[in-house]
């Protein structure tokens, strides 16, 4: 059985911190979906298609990375893709507090899906998207 993971985000824009997490995560599972959130309420700088294209261009050589978009609950997306892992990057303590709350909600909705946290490299900790 393939081990499938999802790294979700808005990626507005894709930056060095995202790229670092993706490069580290891609070798851990058979397939890594980069799930770009369609978040019209966030007032993104770049369109959904532009954000997807940034990621596709950066990782065009990677055969086990798939770039998709989503506008529903992440946990539902994971179930539809048979993904058992959600990948999240952590930079600072406030990231952990938010992610801990999300982890609790996700575990309530689907206890079979695990969340794996990758710490940002020190040089990428100050970097944040929009």
Language-model regions: role of each:
Residues 1-130:
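Nucleotidyltransferase catalytic core that binds NTPs
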């Amino acid at each position: 059985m393939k081990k499938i993971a999802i790294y979700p985000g808005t990626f507005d824009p894709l930056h060095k911190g995202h790229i670092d997490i993706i490069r580290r995560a891609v070798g851990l599972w058979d397939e890594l979906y980069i799930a770009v959130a369609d978040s019209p309420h966030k007032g993104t700088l770049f369109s959904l298609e532009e954000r997807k294209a940034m990621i596709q261009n950066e990782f065009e050589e990677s055969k086990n990375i798939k770039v998709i978009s989503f506008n529903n609950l992440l946990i539902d997306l994971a179930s539809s893709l048979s993904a058992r892992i959600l990948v999240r990057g952590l930079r600072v303590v406030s990231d952990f507090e938010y992610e801990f709350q999300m982890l609790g909600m996700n575990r309530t909705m689907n206890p079979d899906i695990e969340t794996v946290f990758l710490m940002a490299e020190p040089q990428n900790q100050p970097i944040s998207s929009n």
